[in-house]
């Protein structure tokens, strides 16, 4: 009872002075866990409290401990007194805490720690001697980090069950012999960041369970005691980083004693400066093998130590190396994972023990050179493989650009073409009618051009050649050439020389619509002068066609076959207009015949046998010859005007299909464009078939008939083609001798002046210009054979072979050339020419006055005149 009263009194007194007896404001909890025989501690604390609170807590703590019942004391196993500003601590006052297992006195200013647990000598204490025996039997963890402790606490040996001791961040300067003596259960000692200079080699003597010794960031310089400790405890983990080690020859001898892996790590420790080390960086663990081969002559310093330890087993050791900065401050929470972990757990956390691990070796120069050479070769090969196609391509382009003669060959080829074109032009000059060239009837003499400005409105089409079965590379006989031209001229679209012809006279009905065609008129003679051999066989077929067209334009007229489409385009015209115009043509033909006789040309014999007819025919030829003398003046005038002037004097029949064409420049150009459009949509094969079909029904006949001296005279033209067996009928022969009888009346007509003839023609032309629509094609085209200024010599006159029984048809006149349906010629025709024909002499004939633009007069008024 006395004890109870005393306790109540003390409690009341404490409440009066303090004001309250409660639990401290800052609470900390400590949990102790046991796993596999090891202790693990976890704690949390608040370190920022005032000094007054610490004092109150300190007083209340002791009062509470003092007056606690014994039943509660036994259940207290974790006690945390961190950051309480304690300077001196005596564990004797905690002797009644028999269940205490972990005591944390870190982050204080403790500079003296008394662990004397001896019993007092008083009688009262003697009475309770048995009660205080074996105090703190379960204390296993003692944490004293971040204090001001110097030497090892006294009486530490009395803590028999102590397993872990943390003295980090204190002021220890050395470890003596008796520092940890008696702590047989001690497993881990943390002496990090102290000022330890020396360690006694036997400081850890008797600590057979020792596993971890942390000596990082200390002031150690000598390695001899460390080597002794390593040999004593082969499984000991030593933290030796961040120390100023002094390596000498004895250390080199130690490397010979230890294994190769230990020697490499030891060399790294000696050569690594302290400043380069990083905090809390664990180095690899090295285990020293038991079979240590001692050198034959070890150093004198270690010889005695090795002999003293020779009897002890050498099981090997693990040296734990890590780095830390000198100025780093390690907190209590940073060390909790190290203090309470067993050596096995530490090794597992660090990746397990590494045996015989080798550090980085010095680089091998030979290997580096070999690797560099190999890599260089591989890179060069790859670059060459990838760049080779591009290099070859550039080389080929350069060779093509610099190839000699490539551009010269092209220019030479063009020059060759120009020379060849010039030769074609010269060969064209061999024709009899050089006036045709001077009149610029063919503006483009290059046969390679597809379209030529031809006054006839004819367009040369290559498809015509294909439809007629012509091969440009092959040479054809005159007969074959006539066949091909004959097939195209049947429908009125092409001359026999290969040129496309379009209707020129619009508004006139065809001759077939007014006059039936007799079976005997299917074929008429065509002068063999139109068929001549080519000048040179190497020239193309197109050149032959050009030459023949030029000659044909000078020798005679070009009647064209009349197709069925002509009826729709040509309206009916009065016959008296044509009849009046035919009189003038007859007069011109009479003068032509007379002059031809004077020059020695054979005169054609008219079919009607009339003297008046011969006179009229000669008048027509003579008028045409007079027009040819005006060649020089025609060259200065526009092409269309010259053509209109020449065409106005062509022979026309009384049938509307043979009326002369009267066209202006605009009409000729538009007709030419129309011809190109018609030929563009032309199919050669279909057109050939159509030609044969149309030729069987239609034809043209050019005749000169006379019904009286002043009556109607008409020129009829028909073309017919007999398709029996695909062969043409033989041509009628000509008899040039019979025609000479018709020349007797030529002198009677010579008195007619050319001026009257021109006036008549102008009047008729003006009258016909109002009614007729001219096109690119004319039914009849006449030109004279020679110029007055450049008369033809006998050597210039073309000759051709004719059968002796040849006779001129009734429609043939001297100086005219009729193109109709031409059948194939059975015999070859030779064209003889002179070298003088190759030149184009400038004709100095006086220019004729231009055609008067007077208003056209009525034909009836002209007849009255």
Swiss-Prot record:
It is found in: Membrane. Glycans are attached at residues 42, 248, 787. Residues 855-865 have a biased composition (Acidic residues). The chain crosses the membrane at residues 4-24, 366-386. Residues 675-688 have a biased composition (Basic and acidic residues). Residues 470-479, 702-713 have a biased composition (Polar residues). The modification Phosphoserine is found at residues 714, 748. It is a multi-pass membrane protein. Keywords: Glycoprotein, Leucine-rich repeat, Membrane, Phosphoprotein, Repeat, Transmembrane, Transmembrane helix. LRR repeats lie at residues 138-160, 161-182, 185-206, 209-230, 235-255. This is Leucine-rich repeat-containing protein 66. The lineage of its organism: Eukaryota, Metazoa, Chordata, Craniata, Vertebrata.
């Amino acid at each position: 009872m006395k004890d109870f009263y005393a306790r109540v009194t003390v409690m009341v007194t404490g409440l009066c002075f303090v004001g309250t007896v409660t639990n401290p404001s800052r609470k900390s909890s400590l949990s102790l866990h046991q796993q596999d025989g090891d202790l693990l501690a976890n704690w949390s604390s608040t370190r920022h409290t005032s000094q007054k609170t610490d004092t109150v807590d300190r007083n209340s703590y002791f009062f509470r401990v003092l007056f606690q019942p014994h039943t509660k004391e036994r259940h207290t196993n974790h006690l945390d007194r961190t950051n309480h500003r304690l300077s001196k601590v005596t564990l004797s006052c905690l002797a009644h805490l028999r269940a205490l297992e972990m005591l944390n006195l870190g982050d204080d200013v403790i500079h003296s720690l008394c662990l004397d647990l001896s019993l007092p000598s008083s009688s009262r204490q003697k009475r309770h001697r048995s009660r205080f025996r074996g105090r703190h039997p379960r204390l296993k963890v003692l944490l004293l980090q971040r204090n001001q402790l110097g030497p090892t606490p006294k009486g530490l040996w009395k803590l028999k069950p102590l397993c872990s001791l943390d003295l980090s961040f204190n002021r220890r300067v050395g470890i003596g012999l008796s520092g940890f003596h008696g702590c047989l259960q001690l497993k881990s000692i943390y002496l990090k960041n102290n000022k330890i200079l020396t360690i006694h080699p036997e400081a850890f003597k008797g600590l057979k369970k020792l596993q971890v010794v942390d000596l990082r960031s200390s002031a150690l310089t000598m390695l001899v005691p460390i080597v002794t400790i390593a040999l004593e405890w082969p499984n000991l983990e030593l933290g030796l980083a961040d120390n100023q080690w002094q390596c000498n020859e004895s250390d080199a001898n130690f490397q010979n004693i230890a294994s190769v892996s230990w020697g490499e790590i030891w060399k790294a420790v000696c050569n690594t400066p302290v400043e380069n080390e990083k905090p809390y960086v664990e180095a690899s663990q090295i285990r020293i093998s038991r079979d240590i081969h001692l050198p034959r002559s070890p150093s004198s310093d270690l010889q005695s130590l090795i002999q003293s330890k020779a009897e002890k087993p050498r099981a090997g050791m693990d040296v734990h190396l890590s780095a830390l900065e000198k100025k780093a401050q390690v907190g209590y929470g940073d060390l909790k994972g190290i203090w309470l972990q067993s050596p096995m757990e530490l090794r597992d956390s660090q990746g397990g023990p590494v045996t015989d691990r080798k550090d980085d070796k010095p680089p091998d120069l030979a290997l580096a050179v070999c690797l560099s050479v190999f890599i260089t070769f591989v890179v060069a090969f790859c670059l060459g493989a990838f760049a080779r196609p591009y290099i070859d391509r550039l080389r080929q382009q350069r060779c093509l650009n610099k190839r000699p003669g490539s551009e010269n060959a092209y220019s030479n080829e063009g020059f060759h073409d120009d020379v060849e074109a010039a030769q074609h032009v010269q060969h064209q000059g061999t024709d009899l009618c050089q006036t045709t060239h001077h009149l610029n009837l063919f503006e483009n003499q290059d046969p390679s051009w597809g379209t030529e400005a031809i006054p006839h409105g004819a367009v040369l089409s290559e498809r015509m050649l294909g439809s007629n079965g012509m091969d440009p590379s092959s040479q054809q006989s005159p007969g074959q050439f006539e066949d091909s031209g004959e097939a195209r001229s049947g429908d009125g679209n092409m001359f026999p020389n290969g040129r496309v012809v379009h209707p020129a006279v619009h508004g006139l009905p065809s001759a077939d619509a007014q006059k039936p065609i007799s079976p005997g008129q299917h074929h008429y003679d065509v002068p063999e002068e139109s068929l001549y051999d080519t000048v040179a066989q190497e020239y193309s077929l197109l050149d032959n066609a050009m030459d023949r067209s030029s000659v044909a334009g000078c020798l005679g007229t070009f009647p064209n076959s009349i197709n069925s489409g002509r009826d729709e385009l040509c309206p009916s015209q009065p016959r008296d207009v044509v009849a009046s115009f035919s009189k003038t043509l007859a007069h011109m033909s009479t003068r032509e015949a007379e002059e031809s006789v004077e020059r020695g040309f054979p005169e054609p014999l008219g079919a009607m046998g009339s003297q008046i007819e011969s006179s009229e025919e000669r008048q027509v030829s003579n008028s045409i010859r007079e027009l040819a003398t005006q060649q020089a003046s025609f060259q200065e005038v526009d092409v269309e005007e010259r053509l209109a002037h020449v065409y106005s004097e062509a022979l026309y029949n009384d049938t509307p299909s043979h009326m002369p064409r009267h066209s202006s420049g605009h009409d000729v150009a538009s007709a030419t464009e129309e011809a190109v459009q018609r030929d563009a949509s032309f199919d050669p094969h279909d057109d050939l078939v159509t030609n044969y079909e149309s030729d069987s029904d239609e034809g043209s006949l050019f005749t000169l008939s006379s019904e009286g001296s002043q009556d109607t005279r008409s020129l009829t033209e028909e073309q017919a083609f007999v398709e029996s067996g695909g062969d043409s009928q033989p041509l009628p022969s000509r008899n040039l001798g019979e025609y000479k009888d018709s020349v007797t009346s030529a002198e009677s007509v010579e008195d007619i002046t050319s001026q009257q003839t021109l006036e008549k023609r102008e009047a008729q032309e003006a009258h016909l210009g109002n009614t007729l629509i001219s096109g690119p094609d004319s039914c009849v085209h006449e030109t004279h054979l020679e110029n007055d200024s450049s008369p033809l010599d006998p050597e210039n006159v073309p000759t051709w072979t004719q059968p002796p029984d040849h006779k001129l048809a009734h429609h043939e006149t001297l100086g005219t050339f009729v193109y109709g349906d031409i059948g194939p010629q059975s015999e070859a025709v030779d064209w003889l020419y002179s070298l003088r024909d190759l030149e184009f002499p400038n004709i100095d004939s006086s220019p004729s006055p231009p055609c008067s633009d007077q208003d056209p007069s009525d034909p009836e008024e002209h007849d009255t005149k």
